[in-house]
């Protein structure tokens, strides 16, 4: 739900939920998020103004989050599009464990494809353990990648934000964000 709050799609979703509530007073509405901080506000926007008290279920799970920035000593000529940060692949590879499940997020499909090719080129031994995932891939191809991660046969996935919506991987050991995250909720 955190992806919908405060944007045009979220407003459209709220209007649709309002219409559904108007047509069926007994409808049950569920909202879920693994990262949302303002649960009461989200519940209010999902359920509407004149709703019953929501039932909020929270996990007591505590996760240790380590955030580390990889910034090159010399930026040189800064690439403003497409191949953002690709020159820092060696620094990135020092941080990624080949045996750990890792999601490598980029902000665009083009970046994900470039990083995927770069990581494959510099890690031929990972050929069968690295995959690409973005919304423009065939649905069956995306499903194969998701199943490979869940089974453990795929260790690294270079992906766009299409992978952070509605996909639950157990466990993901590392997450890498190349470039700035679209928002702090996505980063965490």
Predicted stretch roles:
Residues 1-188:
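Helicase motor core with emphasis on the C-terminal RecA-like subdomain
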């Amino acid at each position: 739900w955190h992806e919908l709050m405060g944007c045009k799609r979220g407003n459209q979703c709220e209007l649709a939920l309002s219409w559904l509530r108007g047509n069926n007073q007994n409808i049950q509405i569920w909202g879920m998020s693994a990262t949302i901080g303002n649960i009461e506000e989200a519940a209010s926007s999902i359920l509407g103004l004149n709703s019953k008290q929501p039932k909020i279920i929270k996990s007591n799970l505590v996760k240790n989050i380590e955030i580390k920035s990889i910034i090159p000593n010399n930026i040189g000529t800064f690439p403003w599009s497409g191949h953002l940060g690709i020159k820092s692949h060696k620094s990135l590879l020092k941080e990624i464990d080949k045996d750990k499940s890792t999601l490598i997020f980029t902000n665009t499909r083009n970046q994900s494809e470039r990083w995927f090719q770069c990581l494959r080129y510099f890690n031929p031994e990972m050929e069968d353990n690295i995959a690409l995932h973005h919304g423009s891939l065939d649905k069956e191809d995306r499903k194969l990648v998701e199943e490979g991660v869940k089974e453990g046969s795929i260790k690294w996935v270079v992906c766009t934000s299409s992978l952070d919506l509605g996909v639950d991987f157990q466990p993901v050991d590392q997450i890498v964000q190349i470039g700035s995250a679209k928002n702090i909720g996505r980063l965490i």
